[in-house]
Amino acid sequence: MSGHTVLVLYGSQTGTAQDTAERIGRQAQRRRLRVKVEALDTYNVVNLISESLVVFVCATTGQGDPPDNMKKFWRFLFRKSLPADSLSRLDCAVLGLGDSSYPKFNFVAKKLHKRLLQLGANMLLPVGLADDQHDLGPDGVIDPWLLSFWQKTLSLYPPPAGLAPLREEDKLPPRYIFHFLSEVPNKLTEHLQTVDNKSSPTPLRPFPAPLVFNQRVTHTAHFQDVRHIEFDITGSNIEFSAGDTVMMRPCNTSEDVEQLCQLLKLDPESYFTLTPTDSSTEVPARLPQPCSIRFLLEHFLDISAVPRRSFFELLATFATDELEQEKLLEFSSAAGQDTLHSYCNRPRRTALEVLTDFPHTTAELSIGRLLDLFPEIQPRSFSIASSLLEHPNRIQILLAVVKYKTMLVKPRKGLCSSWLASLDPSKGDVYVPLWVKKGSLKFPQDPESPVIMVGPGTGVAPFRSAIQERVAQGKMANVLFFGCRSESKDFYCGSEWQEKVQAGQMILVTAFSRDQEDKVYVQHRVKEQGKLLWDLIAKKNAFFYIAGNAKQMPTSVCDALKAVFQKEGGMSENQAQEMLDGMEKNGRFQSETWS
């Protein structure tokens, strides 16, 4: 092993950047370099001045924001007091993961690259801008970028003479060693850690909130099962405002856990402790020590996700069957990504299903590889759909249950939505560990500022929270555009809106797309209400918000709004765009969309 160390630091929101960082780490090991892979916020940033070689891998979230696990690092790096030559000894490179269908494409990676240059760092390569929209997905950029990175790096930091790189099919050592206990420990509290009564819940110390209400709000004849779910947060110290989100981690189904135990011949009731094989690696903070196999598989490892390319790379190193090895190596290669997409991504085949498709290779897997093979279950976020001012000690959400068919026989289900929908408080106490995170939507403090909200479908959730909060504060200038398929089937919170309209607390404009021959969407209603909107925006300094599915709706609503500016304000197309850009810059136009 070389005396040179490559440090791979990542900022990841959904786990993709972390997976890429770990893949770079394995490539470094194969090239006989020492390596450490770490989240940016767990790394002691003051040590950066003494590092020699660092790769930064970062995603962009929301409106060009850094991921949660690099925010502390981000604030430190942009301190104005840092000297211009702080990082003059550092060789580094930045790889960004993004989606060019969003306006702030790879904004974090670009800004980080620029800041590192300002601080005197020697950039080994131009910033890598991986794109989900690329024909080959992010790997279409990542693969050639990494090829250039290793050529440059190995010329500066060559491995020791006589040490050849490890082949792709050679096994790397596991990250952790499992030590099984001969006896079951007494009285273990694996599931819920107690929350300090004086502090707010965090990802590592979530609040076990009783789920007290779970009811379908769509008509039984409607294709989509949408739930109104309520949690009791009494005694949690949780505070939140309109626009904030509630976070939680789902559990795997007992059926999937049992199936994996059978495949790998594991006893779910056995207990173990973990020791890292590298002294610089720590045991995952969310795993209790000792821990049961059942807890590991049910609460920690993401066994039902669609596996990434790295899953197949690792699996290929265990293949003894020639046909299975050939297929796994193809899936691991740059040339095989189309085939992998057809096999795995398009039909949404899960990691568990892949293991059953490769029985000989699966039989070679040992338990020590579980934490290398499967990523950790990532937290899910939901817009809070209620206000503490109207519902004290409660958090409410609107949950669309994800279920769909692909070419596979078994229907695909969303892990978190299916898990939450299955929880029934009428059959006994149900607890969901959760915490709250600040959202990207900010509502005006000025009581005179009107608020215009466009929230079709479950996109209405943050606006229900905002309207409840604003009405409780005496702010009545609220306009809501709500869209759904049918007034009788999926008009969420319809009676609540009507009550508030009757009380003079809001204006409601609806678009029921399938209740007449011509489809009517929220963007059509925005155009129809042009005079009202122009008056509120141009004369009364109104704020405009969009929330919902990121397919065509946000763009269509923006186009409709610009058409209003042109018609009612007598503007040219360019002037309308400039007005919208100005509103966005001043925080008067905000959107929160998801795919």
UniProtKB/Swiss-Prot annotation:
Keyword Transferase set for record: no
Binding residue positions for NADP(+): T458, S513, R514, K519, V520, Y521, V522, Q523
GO molecular function: electron transfer activity; flavin adenine dinucleotide binding; FMN binding; NADP binding; NADPH-hemoprotein reductase activity; NADPH-iron-sulfur [2Fe-2S] protein oxidoreductase activity; oxidoreductase activity; oxidoreductase activity, acting on NAD(P)H, heme protein as acceptor
Domain Flavodoxin-like: start-end pairs: 6-150
Record GO biological process: iron-sulfur cluster assembly
Record's subcellular location: Cytoplasm, Perinuclear region
Tree of life domain: Eukaryota
The name this protein goes by in its record: NADPH-dependent diflavin oxidoreductase 1
Gene, per the UniProt record: ndor1
